[in-house]
Amino acid sequence: MILLISDLHLQEERPDISRAFLDLLDGRARHAKALYILGDFFEAWIGDDAMTPFQQSICQAMRRLSDSGTAIYLMHGNRDFLIGQAFCKAAGCTLLNDPSVIELGGEQVLLMHGDTLCTRDLGYMKMRRLLRNPLSLWILRHLPLSARYKLARKLRSESRTQVRMKSTEIVDVTPEEVPKVMAAHGVRTLVHGHTHRPAIHKLMVDGQPARRIVLGDWDRRGWALQVDEQGFQLAPFEFS
């Protein structure tokens, strides 16, 4: 069994989500061969050198799962792209490139966070290119902690404002981009998060039937994609 989740947006202000994640680690994930976390794991991450006690507790729980034999793979999201190798080493997880192609359920599957598919959101794409270039990443990681906290608060506030102002079409994936990206990677299944619109979409890629599986965000309930001998099963679950 393989589990895939995304968009937990872990933060101290939402202990219900944190408890649900810890329950997953102590429960279903213990029986999984691997757990994939496809971005926006944390609501914000300003650097491995600034871990709070809350974030350290999550890291330690992940390490316990890793030590028990479940492999953990973590992909950057737009909220936590400063997660680095120091955190991953402590948590016992592997940092996964976005995009990545893995073998899943007997086929090659493309994994993405999903934000790069939203090409109609020109303002976001411009900001993403600015923040993700190597020079910007170096500068961000070497800013004083106070400056990083201030910048993170500013970006989160602006992001919430922009999402409210933009149409749903702009902040969703660009329909034409999806088959193009899938064809470029030679896959018929894509799994991503980011949009908070869980669903399984059918489409055609190079004249062949294909599917796009969108993971759900964790808010009022959690979401997980389970891949086993029964196939690909996307389903929500209630927080205990």
Swiss-Prot record:
Gene3D superfamilies: 3.60.21.10. It is an enzyme of class 3 (hydrolase). GO terms for biological process: lipid A biosynthetic process. GO terms for cellular component: cytoplasm; extrinsic component of plasma membrane. It catalyses: UDP-2-N,3-O-bis[(3R)-3-hydroxytetradecanoyl]-alpha-D-glucosamine + H2O = 2-N,3-O-bis[(3R)-3-hydroxytetradecanoyl]-alpha-D-glucosaminyl 1-phosphate + UMP + 2 H(+). Mn(2+) 1 binds at residues 7, 9, 40, 196. Pathway: Glycolipid biosynthesis; lipid IV(A) biosynthesis; lipid IV(A) from (3R)-3-hydroxytetradecanoyl-[acyl-carrier-protein] and UDP-N-acetyl-alpha-D-glucosamine: step 4/6. Mn(2+) 2 binds at residues 40, 78, 113, 194. Binds 2 Mn(2+) ions per subunit in a binuclear metal center. Keywords: Cell inner membrane, Cell membrane, Hydrolase, Lipid A biosynthesis, Lipid biosynthesis, Lipid metabolism, Manganese, Membrane, Metal-binding. Its cofactor is Mn(2+). It comes from the Bacteria. Its EC number is 3.6.1.54. GO terms for molecular function: manganese ion binding; UDP-2,3-diacylglucosamine hydrolase activity. It is found in: Cell inner membrane. Pfam families: Metallophos. Substrate binds at residues 78-79, 121, 159, 166, 194. It is a peripheral membrane protein. Hydrolyzes the pyrophosphate bond of UDP-2,3-diacylglucosamine to yield 2,3-diacylglucosamine 1-phosphate (lipid X) and UMP by catalyzing the attack of water at the alpha-P atom. Involved in the biosynthesis of lipid A, a phosphorylated glycolipid that anchors the lipopolysaccharide to the outer membrane of the cell. Belongs to the LpxH family. This is UDP-2,3-diacylglucosamine hydrolase.
